[in-house]
Amino acid sequence: MSIQEHVILVNDQGEVVGTQEKYAAHTSHTSLHLAFSSWLFNDRGQCLVTRRALSKIAWPGVWTNSVCGHPQIGETTEQAIARRCRFEVGVEIAQLTPIAADFRYCEIDPSGIVENEICPVFAAQIVSPLKVNPDEVMDYQWVELTSLLRALEATPWAFSPWMVSEAANASEKLKHFADNVKA
């Protein structure tokens, strides 16, 4: 992306306390910041699972939910999700629905990079053809949600930690969404 992205730094109450350049923010001492996580579904109710590009600084090559990112100053979370969906997987979305509005996590990847985010979780339906950005996504699969939830429970080490936690906290809402988008 040609525009330099920032993260919005927040305190424990979610109040904005500043901004920082995205790559400078993600270190072994990452400050709490705003993010979002989205689970995208097709009209068959299948979930898009993506494998993070090897060039990603945190969790490279790891399987995760569809699209994640950070809202920018002056941008709503919904606008940020639509922007990142276009950038990462080349799609337009509809029916953007909050699944876990208060989700928060802090995890350390194997290289020592910390993710420390207030990260509301959303589900949405893809309404245009998929065109993945290889700088973001090295592979992807469409999977039945029930199979994915079983895999997350059986082999959590094979997926991003935020995806595992999101599924554990919001599986019923994800199932409901998947059932409702089936054509």
Swiss-Prot record:
Principal location: cytoplasm
SUPFAM superfamilies recorded: Nudix (SSF55811)
A Pfam family per the record: NUDIX
Superkingdom as given in the UniProt entry: Bacteria
Domain Nudix hydrolase: 31-165
Record bears the keyword RNA-binding: no
Enzyme category, top tier: isomerase
Regions annotated as coiled coil: none
Enzyme active site: 68, 117
Gene Ontology CC: cytoplasm
EC number annotated for this UniProt entry: 5.3.3.2
Cofactor: Mg(2+); Mn(2+)
GO biological process: dimethylallyl diphosphate biosynthetic process; isoprenoid biosynthetic process
Details of cofactor binding: Binds 1 Mg(2+) ion per subunit. The magnesium ion binds only when substrate is bound.
Involved pathway(s): Isoprenoid biosynthesis; dimethylallyl diphosphate biosynthesis; dimethylallyl diphosphate from isopentenyl diphosphate: step 1/1
Presence of keyword Ribosomal protein: no
Reactions it catalyzes: isopentenyl diphosphate = dimethylallyl diphosphate
Function: Catalyzes the 1,3-allylic rearrangement of the homoallylic substrate isopentenyl (IPP) to its highly electrophilic allylic isomer, dimethylallyl diphosphate (DMAPP).
Entry similarity comment: Belongs to the IPP isomerase type 1 family.
NCBIfam families reported in the protein's UniProt record: IPP_isom_1, PRK03759.1
Subunit structure: Homodimer.
Stored HAMAP family: Idi
Name of the featured protein: Isopentenyl-diphosphate Delta-isomerase
Taxonomic lineage: Bacteria, Pseudomonadati, Pseudomonadota, Gammaproteobacteria, Enterobacterales
Name of the encoding gene: idi
